[in-house]
Amino acid sequence: TCRYLFGGCKTTADCCKHLACRSDGKYCAWDGTF
């Protein structure tokens, strides 16, 4: 299952669609896409 907004992650692949893994905070954040 994918990680939702502010969920923990190691890479962007861990996050749900339209989310990207922040390298500084290790959490999923919106990547700016719709």
Curated annotation (Swiss-Prot):
One matching Pfam family: Toxin_12
Mutation effect (residue 25 to A): No change in interaction with Kv2.1 channels
A molecular function GO annotation: ion channel inhibitor activity
Organism whose genome encodes this protein: Stromatopelma calceatum griseipes (Feather leg baboon tarantula)
Keyword Disulfide bond: yes
GO cellular component: extracellular space
Disulphide linkage map: 2-16, 9-21, 15-28
Site (May be involved in interaction with voltage sensor): 3, 5-6, 22
Result of changing residue 31 to A: Exhibits 11.3-fold weaker interaction with Kv2.1 channels
UniProt keywords, alphabetically: Disulfide bond, Ion channel impairing toxin, Knottin, Neurotoxin, Potassium channel impairing toxin, Secreted, Toxin, Voltage-gated potassium channel impairing toxin
Subcellular location(s) of the protein: Secreted
Effect noted on mutating residue 13 to S: No change in interaction with Kv2.1 channels
UniProt superkingdom: Eukaryota
Effect of residue 26 to A: No change in interaction with Kv2.1 channels
Principal subcellular localisation of the protein: secreted
Keyword match Secreted: yes
Site (May be involved in interaction with voltage sensor, positioned at 9 angstroms from the center of the bilayer): 30
Miscellaneous information on this protein: Shows no or very low activity on Nav1.2/SCN2A, Nav1.4/SCN4A, Nav1.5/SCN5A, Nav1.6/SCN8A, and Nav1.7/SCN9A (IC(50)>3 uM).
Family, as annotated: Belongs to the neurotoxin 10 (Hwtx-1) family. 09 (HaTx) subfamily.
Protein name: Kappa-theraphotoxin-Scg1a
